[in-house]
Amino acid sequence: MPMIEVKVTMDLPAEKRDLLKAEFGKAISIMGKPESYLMINLVDKQDLYFGGKKLDKGAYVEVKVLGSIDGGASDKMTAKLCEILEKELGIPGNAVYVSYWGTANWGWNGSNF
């Protein structure tokens, strides 16, 4: 039931997509969610602006989960996501926004949980 959507400014070749998928798959456990239900959407070549300036390297990340968001877990998740983006893509943490969304209604396979 978790979903991670990442929009980045640069091109993401297949090998980088695979690395990100693997790292996000491990990281989702911080939120108490299983990788077996994780959906990931990687969107590259986006125009992102911060403080009125276009970012050469930047990212916007949305983390969506079934249920409520634990503040402590989201703090740890933000740190981990920024670490992954810095390591794999060279995106500094001050060029990353992360938002969290929790919902009581999540559909899958023809019904809601």
Spans of model-derived segments:
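Interaction-mediating elements
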Residues: M1-F113
